[in-house]
Amino acid sequence: MAKSKDVRVTIILECTSCVRNGVNKESTGISRYITQKNRHNTPSRLELKKFCPYCYKHTIHGEIKK
């Protein structure tokens, strides 16, 4: 079966400061959120400001590859 060309796609947002800093010593992971975006309205990579429980603050979460 061929891949569907849906307009809305599921994406994963990952904390950019956790990835850049290599995660704090006491934290156990990297913050990730799953959401959807409209491929026609937002063709570029999505970046949203979300709360990171590992950094304990609001940081920019960027779209990553699946």
Swiss-Prot record:
Organism field: Gossypium hirsutum
Family classification: Belongs to the bacterial ribosomal protein bL33 family.
Originating gene: rpl33
A Pfam entry, by short name: Ribosomal_L33
PROSITE patterns: RIBOSOMAL_L33 (PS00582)
Keyword Lyase: no
Name of the protein described by the UniProt record: Large ribosomal subunit protein bL33c
GO cellular component: chloroplast; ribonucleoprotein complex; ribosome
InterPro entries on file: Ribosomal_bL33, Ribosomal_bL33_CS, Ribosomal_bL33_sf, Ribosomal_zn-bd
